[in-house]
């Protein structure tokens, strides 16, 4: 059976932690099914700050959230889960070493690691054993529908409602 969820996303890049937490609370109170928070900064200090923000968010909301973050080493993934995140989203075009991604999938499960891709690439041909792709910048046309069917995975479409 097909179903839809409302999963707002919050870009934590260059944003005050208090603003991210407040926005997460507002989405939670407004009836969101889950949240997707991300900060793909490659700067270590900014990633650590984002992890602290995720911990604050986890204390304030009662819905699951996914966290997107630049992964440099396996410990980064463990840190994300320690914040209370239900799933990790890895941006495919930032992956330097697919063996890290494969290790994360083997350790945490294919249902806990999502891969974020642009709709214009052939995501259906990515040889990773994940259950879900998060696809951004989507124009739903016949070619996109064919890719979705060939991928044989769950697809979350990340798009602005505005």
Can you describe what each PLM-predicted range is?
Residues 40-42, 79-100, 132-144, 154-162:
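Glycine-rich phosphate-binding active-site loops on the catalytic face of alpha/beta enzymes
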């Amino acid at each position: 059976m097909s179903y839809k969820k409302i999963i707002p996303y919050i870009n934590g890049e260059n944003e005050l932690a208090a603003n991210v937490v407040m926005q997460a609370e507002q989405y939670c109170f407004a009836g969101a099914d889950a949240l997707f928070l991300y900060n793909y900064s490659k700067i270590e200090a900014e990633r650590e700050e984002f992890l602290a923000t995720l911990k604050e968010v986890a204390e304030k909301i009662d819905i699951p959230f996914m966290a997107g973050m630049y992964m440099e080493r396996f410990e980064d993934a463990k840190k994300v889960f320690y914040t209370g995140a239900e799933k990790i989203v890895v941006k495919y075009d930032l992956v330097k070493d697919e063996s890290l991604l494969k290790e994360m999938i083997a350790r945490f499960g294919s249902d806990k690691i999502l891969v974020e891709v642009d709709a214009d690439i052939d995501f259906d041909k990515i040889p990773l054993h994940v259950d879900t792709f998060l696809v951004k910048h989507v124009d739903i046309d016949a070619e996109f529908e064919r890719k979705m069917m060939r991928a044989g995975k769950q697809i979350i479409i990340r798009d602005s409602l505005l």
